[in-house]
From Swiss-Prot:
Keywords: Ribonucleoprotein, Ribosomal protein. GO terms for cellular component: large ribosomal subunit. The gene is rpmF. HAMAP family: Ribosomal_bL32. This is Large ribosomal subunit protein bL32. Residues 1-61 are annotated as: Disordered. It comes from Afipia carboxidovorans (strain ATCC 49405 / DSM 1227 / KCTC 32145 / OM5). Pfam families: Ribosomal_L32p. One of its GO terms (molecular function) is structural constituent of ribosome. It comes from the Bacteria. Residues 17-44 have a biased composition (Basic and acidic residues). GO terms for biological process: translation. Belongs to the bacterial ribosomal protein bL32 family. Residues 1-16 have a biased composition (Basic residues).
């Protein structure tokens, strides 16, 4: 059975666990509509991505 040769220090253990924390999602303000959206994602309200219409928008009644 594999056994660690040395005890893991608290610093090394903490550095390993630092990647486990949940990260806050980032949002950017859309230049055209002013809505908040995720970076590199299309704007669902307008259907635009990088200045092009990529999604047909449903009309709200």
């Amino acid at each position: 059975m594999a056994v660690p040769r040395r005890k893991t220090s608290p610093s090394r253990r903490g550095m390993r666990r630092s990647a486990d924390a949940l990260k806050k999602p980032t949002y950017v303000e859309d230049k055209d509509s002013g809505e908040l959206r995720r970076p590199h994602h299309l704007d669902l309200k307008t259907g635009m991505y990088k200045g092009r219409q990529v999604l047909k928008v449903k009309k709200e009644d």
